[in-house]
């Protein structure tokens, strides 16, 4: 790295995982849970030089004695003190950089409240003294990562799902739909249906085990009813999973019943439309002239779109809703778990982007509201 060329930092703060690294890299250097843990009981670890809080993987590994909290709920920061701890951990422990020496690109959920963008801006400039920063919308970055500037992004992470139509690089706010159904809800639902099978998972620590079961064994059925029939008549769909204590459990139709809730939110007692219908509804809120371009560029993004079978099922469901002659294409990049971060890395390393950063000087002159003028 030559001296005059300082790499920008790219931090994608998800509800479940924080992805961080350097602009120009093709993958994030650090990926850790967006968790802050505090000891449940005072002084149980005598002589351990006990800290009053733990972040990320360390909180995860000590989860037995901690109470875990996620500062980002449904994609939006709700606890700023904890959020600051996560950023501090990102810069100093994970990336090992001095934030006052690097421009920082942060990501935000679509329709993020204005006050939140201002608070992010304020913390970056006042707490971390960054020389420059920018806030980009997550779904737009995913679209860039797929090499497009027009399309509709179905972005589903741990805390929230959005359908975001984007035309020539601009998100169309009137047509963005938010669905408060994502990975965390699916983990909770899997906990519930495994309980019905006689396995008990209740604590925050056990929830992480169920999340692992979900990530390793779940898939989306192309035809739910048919899959249920197959599961009932044979054991061909059953898989076993070994718990940390050595006990082995069997998972059957739960494997596809869990992510089916994405298409049928009524499974979770929610009245909202499924992800296929939300995608369709979002497209229908757009100008009739651009719908064709959106149908042909449906881009999946985020960890909750990683289930095997989800792209085929989306293709089938959207085709059933759309006009019969419409060409429909679902794009599911293999790296879509990190495509928001990758898009940020691409954006922050473009030469044309360098004049777009909000500088410390601009912030000092205008205050936090500068973010609304500079970041669309």
Curated annotation (Swiss-Prot):
Keyword field contains Hydrolase: yes
Gene: act-1a
N-acetylaspartate: modified positions: 3
Disulfide bonds: none
Protein name (record): Actin-1
Catalytic activity: ATP + H2O = ADP + phosphate + H(+)
Domain of life: Eukaryota
Keywords, in A-Z order: Acetylation, ATP-binding, Cytoplasm, Cytoskeleton, Hydrolase, Nucleotide-binding
GO CC entries: cytoplasm; cytoskeleton
PANTHER family (UniProt xref): ACTIN
Entry function: Actins are highly conserved proteins that are involved in various types of cell motility and are ubiquitously expressed in all eukaryotic cells.
Keyword Ribosomal protein annotated: no
Localisation per UniProt entry: Cytoplasm, Cytoskeleton
Recorded family membership: Belongs to the actin family.
